[in-house]
Structures are given as C-alpha cells and as structure tokens.
C-alpha cells in the first residue's frame, strides 16, 4: 500500500513575535519546514500535501515543486487542517502520516519506524508518543488497564489525574487514509479551544472497536515543537550537537564542539581541524586536512585541501588547495583563490580571481581584479575600482611585482613580469617586462628644516 504525508504549516506562530511564518524560522541553516520535509522523505510518500495559511506564498516558495499545497484560510485546529487535504487524499488506499511543520528535530528514522510499527500491528491509527517528567502543555495518552490507547486528552481538557500522565502526544500520527477522512466527518468543536482536534479521531476509532496503537520515541528531543524563541534556541542547540557529532564520527577534529556552529548542509572531509568559535554556513565545503582557527566565518564557499584559514571571513567564494588566509582577512563574494595563494592580515578581496602562488601579505584591497600567478602585492596596495557610479576591472598578469603603498586605478592592465615602484599611482596600462613609476621625484632642500619653529636651533 502507498504512503501519504500531510505537513501542517498554516499557523502564524504568535509567540514567535515575528512577521515570518513560524515554520520558516531556521534551525542549522534551513527552515523548520525543510527539516520536516526531509525527514518525511524517509517514508517515500506517494503524495505529500502541505497545509498553508498565514503568508502562504512565503511557505509555498520554500517547497515549490516538491509538494502539493492546500490552504487553510481560517485556523480552526489540526483536525480542520487535515480536512483541507480531502480533495487530494480522500478515497485513496494507504497510510497517511500527519506531522506538524514546527518539529525540526524529528528524524527520518523515527518516522520510518512509526510507519513500520503501524503496518506491522495492523492499526487503524498510530500515535507517535514520548515520555517526559514535565508533561505540562502536552496532550496526554490515556490508556486502559491493558495498556491499550483509549484517547488523547489536551492539557486544557485534562482532569487532575490525567495531568499526571507522563506519556505525551507529539502531534505526529499515522492513519489508515480512508478511515481518517471518514472519521473527520464526525468530529466537532465541543472543547475548551472551540477547534476541530485531530486527536478526536482517536476516540472515534476506539468507539467503533478499531485498533489504535502508540509508538514511543527513544529520544524525547525529537518531540520538540517550536512555539517560541526559547524552543527555537533549544532546537538549534540539539541540532548543532547532532551535526558536530556526525562530523567527529567521520574524522573531523573539534577543539570545542559546543562553541562551533555548522549548518546542516555543510560538507567536511576527514582530518579537518576546527577550533572554537568557527561558523560554517549554507552550502560550504571544506577539503581534507584544512585548519580553521578561532573566529573563522565561512558562508556558501568551497575551501580546498590543506588550507589554513585564520580568524577570517569567506563569503560565496572558492579557495583552492594549500591556500592561507588571515588573520583578519575578508574574502567577499564571487572571488576565487588559486592553489598556494597567501592572503594575509587585513587584506580584502572582492569579486576577484587570483592565480596560484600569488601573495598579498598585508593591508591590501583587491577588488574586481583578474590576477595571474606568482604576483606579489606589497603592503598598502589598493586597486581603485569605483568612480562613484561605475565599477571597473583591473587585469594583472603573471609574475608581476607591485611595490608597497601603490594605488592602481581601474580600468588598467599590468602586463606579465612588470613591476610597479613603491608609492606609485598607476592610471595607464603597464606593458609586459616594464617598470612603472607613478610618483613625484624626491626633492631635498638643504638646511630648510632649520627655518621651522620646532627645530632645536629655534628653541
């Protein structure tokens, strides 16, 4: 039989105090909704339907082309949300997973186990449960003396006795699809919230003598539903521990994993060394035996093998094997550094390609440049690429030497093997093998200093 999935993502998330729909808040680099969608993929659903509501267009944009959408214009409870999927799923034979889009810690393995449990026990409904010493706020699982599930009771509707139950409802279920939509026609809003509860379906199945089961999570963390910023931070912390643990198992060394922040889609090769306070975001890839020191921040970039990045920022760029960057360097978007390049302290590279073995040791700005191999930039070199309205390109050939404190005003080209004298301002192309000196000739005025009031003769 087929599997189907319903993801509930219509809520506003008032307690988040945000204009962004709750399910779009990020955990480890991607939205909570994307985490849930990826985990749902473990059951290989034939159809996935996402229920949207508040700012539906933003939610649909995240999963565009990956799921069908239905709109819950008025949020009248979880049961009502599932009713919205009726035009797509009613009458189909199979098993339907219902899951909230604000549960980013649920794993695909647990959802697969839930489906298998449901099928193997021939249940009409199976509840994913968890156990906790602090069940306040959760729906409780009420069982009979034979440990069979009788019903789920919400916190506001629970008796004092029921509030003591430690087994809680995680808000994730599997149903026989056909029976689910039949039962939904019989639920009502006679409860403290005045809403249609999906949990009332469980009571209907019990009344008709149908089999209802519960599969208990091994890890309570997976049950976390994020309703505010506190829970969001908790989810971030748990996810970060999972991610770092995975990388350590795969051969990556962490000095302090609790102070290292790695997004879920980052790829890291074995033998990489990561110091504390390193952040790796987005689609970043790190090659083998690279060292990332304290304070390094990398976004959507590829770093090759054997590189050393020291307390620097790299954004949307590529760094080849054996490159050294930093400390305090900034590689801005759309830059590429060839093999064995050295970018030293207080150097900024922006929108530039730099050939192998080129060095910019300190206090240099390289913007909108095409730089060849074996180039040396002296301290204080500035490429001037902006005239207040337009940006221009500088082309520097192979084996060029740029003396310290030089200013290169684009558009300009420095030919292969050329040399720029220290302190020069370059405004014209420099031919290959030429020396360019663009500064005033030094003039010494003998004895002139004796006329100045601060000279010792005038004290």
From Swiss-Prot:
Cellular component terms per the entry's GO annotation: cytoplasm; membrane
Binding site for acetyl-CoA: 379, 385-386, 404, 422, 439
Entry GO MF terms: glucosamine-1-phosphate N-acetyltransferase activity; magnesium ion binding; UDP-N-acetylglucosamine diphosphorylase activity
Residues that bind Mg(2+): 102, 227
Cofactor binding, note field: Binds 1 Mg(2+) ion per subunit.
Matching Pfam families: Hexapep_2, NTP_transferase
Binding site for UDP-N-acetyl-alpha-D-glucosamine: 8-11, 22, 72, 77-78, 139, 154, 169, 227, 332, 350, 365, 376
Cofactors: Mg(2+)
Residues covered by region (Pyrophosphorylase): 1-229
Subcellular location: Cytoplasm
Enzyme class of the recorded protein, top EC level: transferase
GO process annotations (BP): cell morphogenesis; cell wall organization; lipid A biosynthetic process; peptidoglycan biosynthetic process; regulation of cell shape; UDP-N-acetylglucosamine biosynthetic process
Pathway the protein contributes to: Nucleotide-sugar biosynthesis; UDP-N-acetyl-alpha-D-glucosamine biosynthesis; N-acetyl-alpha-D-glucosamine 1-phosphate from alpha-D-glucosamine 6-phosphate (route II): step 2/2; Nucleotide-sugar biosynthesis; UDP-N-acetyl-alpha-D-glucosamine biosynthesis; UDP-N-acetyl-alpha-D-glucosamine from N-acetyl-alpha-D-glucosamine 1-phosphate: step 1/1; Bacterial outer membrane biogenesis; LPS lipid A biosynthesis
Reactions performed catalytically: alpha-D-glucosamine 1-phosphate + acetyl-CoA = N-acetyl-alpha-D-glucosamine 1-phosphate + CoA + H(+); N-acetyl-alpha-D-glucosamine 1-phosphate + UTP + H(+) = UDP-N-acetyl-alpha-D-glucosamine + diphosphate
Active site: 362
Region ranges (Linker): 230-250
Top-level lineage group: Bacteria
Record-linked PROSITE patterns: HEXAPEP_TRANSFERASES
Keywords annotated in UniProt: Acyltransferase, Cell shape, Cell wall biogenesis/degradation, Cytoplasm, Magnesium, Metal-binding, Multifunctional enzyme, Nucleotidyltransferase, Peptidoglycan synthesis, Repeat, Transferase
Family indicated by similarity: In the N-terminal section; belongs to the N-acetylglucosamine-1-phosphate uridyltransferase family.
Primary role: Catalyzes the last two sequential reactions in the de novo biosynthetic pathway for UDP-N-acetylglucosamine (UDP-GlcNAc). The C-terminal domain catalyzes the transfer of acetyl group from acetyl coenzyme A to glucosamine-1-phosphate (GlcN-1-P) to produce N-acetylglucosamine-1-phosphate (GlcNAc-1-P), which is converted into UDP-GlcNAc by the transfer of uridine 5-monophosphate (from uridine 5-triphosphate), a reaction catalyzed by the N-terminal domain.
Listed name of the protein: Bifunctional protein GlmU
Species the sequence originates in: Streptococcus pneumoniae (strain 70585)
Lineage: Bacteria, Bacillati, Bacillota, Bacilli, Lactobacillales
Gene (UniProt): glmU
């Amino acid at each position: 039989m087929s599997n189907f999935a319903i993801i509930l993502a219509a809520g506003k998330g008032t307690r988040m105090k945000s204009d962004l729909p709750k399910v779009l808040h990020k955990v480890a680099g991607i939205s909570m909704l994307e985490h849930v969608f990826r985990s749902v993929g473990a059951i290989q659903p034939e159809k996935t339907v996402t229920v949207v509501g508040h700012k539906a267009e933003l939610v649909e944009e995240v999963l565009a082309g990956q799921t069908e959408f239905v709109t819950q214009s008025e949020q009248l409870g979880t049961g009502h949300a599932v009713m919205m999927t009726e035009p797509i799923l009613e009458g189909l034979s199979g098993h339907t997973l219902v899951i909230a889009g604000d549960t980013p810690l649920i794993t695909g393995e647990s959802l697969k186990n839930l489906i298998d449990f449901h099928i193997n026990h021939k249940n009409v409904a199976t509840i994913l449960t968890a156990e906790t010493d602090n069940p306040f706020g959760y729906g409780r699982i009420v069982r009979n003396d034979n440990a069979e599930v009788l019903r789920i009771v919400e916190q506001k509707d629970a008796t004092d006795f029921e509030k003591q139950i430690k087994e809680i409802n995680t808000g994730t279920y599997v149903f026989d699809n056909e029976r689910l939509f039949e039962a939904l026609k019989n639920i009502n809003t006679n409860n403290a919230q005045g809403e249609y509860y999906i949990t009332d379906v469980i009571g209907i199945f019990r009344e008709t003598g149908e089999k209802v089961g519960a599969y208990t999570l091994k890890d309570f963390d997976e049950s976390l539903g994020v309703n505010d910023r506190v829970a969001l931070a908790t989810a971030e912390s748990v996810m970060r521990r999972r991610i770092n643990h995975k990388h350590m198992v795969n051969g990556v060394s962490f000095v302090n994993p609790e102070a290292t922040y790695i997004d879920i889609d980052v790829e890291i090769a074995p033998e990489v060394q990561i110091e504390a306070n390193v952040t790796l975001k987005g689609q970043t890839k790190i090659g083998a035996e690279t060292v990332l020191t304290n304070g390094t921040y990398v976004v959507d970039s590829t770093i090759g093998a054997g590189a050393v990045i020291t307390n620097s920022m790299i954004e949307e760029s590529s760094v080849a094997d054996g490159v050294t960057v930093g400390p305090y360097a900034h590689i801005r978007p759309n830059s590429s550094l060839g093999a064995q390049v050295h970018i030293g302290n207080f150097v900024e590279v922006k929108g530039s390609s730099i050939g192998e073995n080129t060095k910019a040791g300190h206090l240099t700005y390289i913007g909108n440049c095409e730089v060849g191999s074996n180039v040396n930039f002296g301290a204080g070199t500035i490429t001037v690429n902006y005239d207040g309205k337009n940006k221009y390109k500088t082309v520097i050939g192979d084996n060029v030497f740029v003396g310290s404190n030089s200013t290169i005003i684009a558009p300009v080209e420095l030919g292969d093997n050329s040399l720029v004298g220290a302190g020069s301002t370059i405004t014209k192309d420099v031919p290959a093998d030429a020396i360019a000196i663009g500064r005033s000739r030094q003039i010494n005025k003998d004895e002139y200093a004796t006329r100045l009031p601060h000279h010792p003769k005038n004290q």
